[in-house]
Amino acid sequence: EISACLVGSEMCIRDSPHSFYNAVMNTNYIDELNESQCAAVTYNDGPSLVIAGAGSGKTRVLTYKIAYLLEQENGYNPWNILALTFTNKAAREMKERIARQVGMERARYLWMGTFHSIFSRILRAEATFIGFTSQFTIYDTADSKSLLRSIIKEMGLDEKTYKPGVVQARISNAKNHLVTPTGYAANKEAYEGDMAAKMPAIRDIYTRYWDRCRQAGAMDFDDLLVYTYILFRDFPEVLARYRDQFRYVLVDEYQDTNYAQHSIVLQLTKENQRVCVVGDDAQSIYSFRGADIDNILYFTKIYPNTKVFKLEQNYRSTQTIVCAANSLIEKNERQIRKAVFSEKEKGEPIGVFQAYSDVEEGDIVANKIAELRREYRYGYADFAILYRTNAQSRISVSYTHLTLPTN
């Protein structure tokens, strides 16, 4: 259905007097790139891994690479390019940038979006293959928890032991590893983990949850990955169609991909080897959500002919900040080594305050803000405070105590 739609679109565009096929493309953007960025953008002879340090122009490289692919003689049609991101905002910004290079008429036909939005689009077109209709419902987190709560109650289980949020996380983890209820029930390690957590009924809850979702014609967010993988695995003719359509696949923030996402990318690209992934193993912080750093660390082993590009110039931070970050990252035992540098000024030294309690930590921050406001007449909006988790509420208590407004 999608292929037919896109072919129809192509015919309409070619017949249009305003066809982008007749447009004169602007190639000046290549001159804006440094040597490493340019090499990454212009290489398209096989799989490529772009290791992009913080502030190194990663988004520019991705967007310019897509523009470059589109404007080459005998190049790619927009609908032959699949670009996967982790947020709708990132996809929207990238498409806007590409449109400025090649025109909105051309950019609009790109397959660009989050993993979930793209796979949802594919699943709706191919729903009958996996026993759904194209109108299937997508459950959000609240819907999923509500259904799990009902199942837990129906099974007569203690909700204090089987907390819906905890159960949901365990099921989500299974799905992110492409483990269906049948596989979960047969998995000794999963069962032992559930027993250790005093939740031996997880396997039964998972089975009921899976069945109830199918009966309701619904998928949760994780199902969008699982069913896409199953679709491509069990119906090779469908996979072949999408392999033929997506002649080039690009993936942003590859260090944040989980096993399921990585596996689907592999399904689509292992044969034609036209894939470019961009990321930074040093920025991998989402393992608690299923991200698998091995996807980027071992990319060159999975795609042996990979060309590796390293974007090492940081355009955002001062030398002091870059050196401090490098001194910490170099201690990582497993990493793709790079020499990040900055040509900006040295900058202010980094101050470190060691507190002896969370209360004192909050007081130090609040008092420092008050001191700087008195000395330099700063406004509250001039300060940004970062903390690791929302559970660090003592800082907020200090703000309240000292009547410091927060936004």
Question: PLM features: residue spans?
Answer:
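Conserved SAM-binding loop
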Residues: 83, 112, 277, 310, ...
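ATP-hydrolysis module of ASCE/P-loop NTPase motor domains
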Residues: 44, 107-109, 127-223, 246, ...
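Single conserved hydrophobic/aromatic residue that forms the stacking wall/gate
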Residues: 1-15, 401-407
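Helicase P-loop NTPase motor core
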Residues: 50, 56-62, 304-307, 312-399
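P-loop NTPase Walker
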Residues: 18-134, 138, 240, 294, ...
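Short glycine-/polar-rich loops that comprise or flank the Walker A/P-loop
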Residues: 46, 77-80, 107-108, 271-273, ...
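Conserved helicase NTPase motor core
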Residues: 31-42, 46-50, 61, 82-83, ...
